[in-house]
Amino acid sequence: MKQQIRLSDHFTYRKLLQFVFPSIIMMIFTSIYGVVDGLFVSNFAGKTAFAAINLVMPFIMVLGGIGFMIGTGGTALVSKTLGEGRQEEANRYFSMMILFTALLGVLLSVTGVVFMRPVALFLGATPEMLEDCVRYGRIVNAFTAAFMLQNVFQSFLIAAEKPKLGLAATVAAGVTNMALDALFVAGFRWGIAGAAVATGLSQCVGGLFPLVYFLRPNSSRLRLVRTRLELRPLLNACGNGSSELMSNISSSIVSMLYNFQLLKYIGEDGVSAYGVLMYVQFIFIAIDIGYSIGCAPIVGFHYGAQNHAELKNMLKKSVLLMCASGAVLTVLASVLAAPLAKLFVGYDEGLYTLTCHAFRLFSFAFLFAGFNIFASSFFTALGNGLISAAISFLRTLVFQTASVLILPLIFDVDDIWYAITVAEVFATLISVIFLFAKRKKYHYMECSPHGKK
């Protein structure tokens, strides 16, 4: 019988990739939700409905980001507590995070449904797009609690040493989404509403399946126990995981700015082309995010156990893997630009040509993105939410916003597609500076004789 990989193990490249592989696949399937919606809506409901989804997606992703914030910050706290040998307290923290997520999800769901129309108008919905924006946004927001729970469990299942269970739940949700999209959008011709219902029901599968698992007797490292909400650990988790929320909010703001700029300079086709780029980026970046989510509990555990040698091992291997991943993804993005554009917008020759061109310019961003995502996640796992948030804030809100606004003014309008790449280069410099600045505090660049084996 194959031996289960434990957080306390020493990780070789093979063992590390085996442990994080379910998380990577899990994130890819999660990203497929929006991609499949966009694919079916674009081909069966038209480019106006497709543009409407792209316009409201930033708002929806902010709500999902809150789940990631609680999940990553809470997992760092729970993993560190496990590393310190305090099992009962780890279970209490875990249960507290799940309860808080469920209650907050219901509140945000109601708020999103009620205020979807003014939100769509604020995001710049044209009269032609408005009703589609409101319809899609309200239906998807009705499932916010399940969406947030799904994002939270993605992190906690890894800390519970059950990454394959997380993968199974996410694959089940992804298959549900694709099957229902085919049925509701292509079969019943429900249009944008069918895509929204398919997404919402798939999120229920991804969020409620792990909840049922933890409510029953199980063999994982974590248990749901009776608990009450406590301000200090909740603030600790939310503060530490704030970089994930910051990243989602900032990315959403950048997407809004991109849409505004593209509507101004290129028109509705620019928004649709950007939508295709974002969908493909979701899948590509999911590889880096999945890796970072997968190794974060390992980092948190060994930080709690004061095993400095293993921290150094994790950092070295992760940096090399992220560099290799960036090179491969950049080449793939360039090679697959035409077939992927054809898949989404092949019905419109002008839009197809624009999307292919934009895709090739945009692809260089993947060279640097993985390293920056890992650096932010690494500091979250170490309990330093401030630096993690700073990397995310500068990478997305500051550098990307500045690039989107300034590049078309200084250079050609075409250079707006380079904005993300320029931002990632500056973010890489910041990440390297922070890693070197904090090396003595966390000892991840030295083999400490005091580290435990």
Predicted feature descriptions by range:
Residues 8-45, 58-73, 77, 81, ...:
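N-terminal transmembrane alpha-helices
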